[in-house]
């Protein structure tokens, strides 16, 4: 059965590149009006323009989602474009690399701000808007590191574990009110976020995946669209991995 979102409006954060861009493009191709949100207006507008060029409907918004007022404005933009029926809290950053005992405090606050607080803000402002719109579905972008540890990334790992817990809690709260909420946990995906990795580092990452390669943004997007669709109507409060066997080791 083909997934369709005609008559639905989606808000996707971190949609200027990588996984978020793939999700925004796929949602638009499936008929949704997409509010493309990114830190940089230029990046968001570029994706919105691509959607328009392909015959879809999109609006571009920007700002730092670590600021609750920015997220509130992004939700308002969705409401101005037909409501809020689909929400993907995807924005994220990697942060500094350092062991917990040496981790910079400002780095901790920055990572928690974008990777955890922004997800809460998306739920805090998005859920009332979604209820007003008649219900819908939400996907929070976690990570494989929402279930395992990873040395020298304490803030990232802590945030992603918390996203999984927040997802399960909110899903319980709104399961009877027409809102489903799930989390997706990608492994290492071949996106611009890995552009600074040299060949040795990429090979080290690849070796951690039994599939023998990095993931593709389209593979994550395919799962996200399924979870947002009516085909996943009995799935809520779940954490779904896209990891090439990473956590099976």
Residue ranges and their predicted role:
Residues 3-35:
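Canonical Rossmann dinucleotide-binding motif of NAD(H)/NADP(H)-dependent dehydrogenases/reductases
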Residues 98-100, 104-112, 194, 205:
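Substrate-binding pocket helix/loop in short-chain dehydrogenase/reductase
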Residues 123, 159, 167:
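Active-site helix of classical SDR
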Residues 128, 172-176, 233:
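Alpha-helical segment proximal to the catalytic Tyr-Lys
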Residues 143:
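Residue(s) in the substrate-gating loop at a strand-loop-helix junction
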């Amino acid at each position: 059965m083909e997934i369709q979102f005609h008559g639905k409006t989606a808000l996707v954060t971190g949609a200027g590149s990588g996984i978020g861009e793939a999700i925004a493009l796929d949602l638009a191709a499936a008929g949704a009006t997409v509010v493309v949100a990114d830190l940089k207006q230029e990046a968001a507008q570029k994706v919105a323009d691509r959607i328009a060029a392909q015959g879809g409907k999109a609006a571009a918004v920007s700002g730092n989602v670590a600021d609750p007022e920015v997220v509130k404005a992004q939700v308002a933009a969705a409401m101005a474009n037909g409501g809020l029926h689909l929400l993907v809290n995807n924005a994220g950053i990697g942060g500094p690399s350092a062991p917990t005992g040496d981790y910079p405090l400002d780095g901790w606050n920055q990572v928690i701000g974008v990777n955890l607080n922004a997800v809460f803000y998306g739920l805090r402002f998005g859920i009332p808007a979604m209820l007003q719109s008649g219900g819908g579905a939400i996907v929070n972008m976690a990570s494989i590191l929402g279930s395992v540890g990873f040395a020298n990334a304490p803030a990232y790992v802590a945030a992603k574990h918390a996203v999984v817990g927040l997802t399960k809690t909110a899903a319980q709260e709104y399961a009877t009110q027409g809102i489903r909420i799930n989390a997706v946990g990608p492994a290492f995906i071949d996106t611009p976020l890995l552009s600074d990795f040299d060949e040795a580092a990429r090979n080290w990452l690849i070796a951690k995946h039994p599939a023998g390669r990095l993931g593709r943004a389209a593979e994550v997007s395919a799962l996200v669209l399924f979870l947002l669709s009516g085909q996943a109507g009995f799935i809520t409060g779940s954490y779904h991995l896209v990891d090439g066997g990473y956590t099976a080791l």
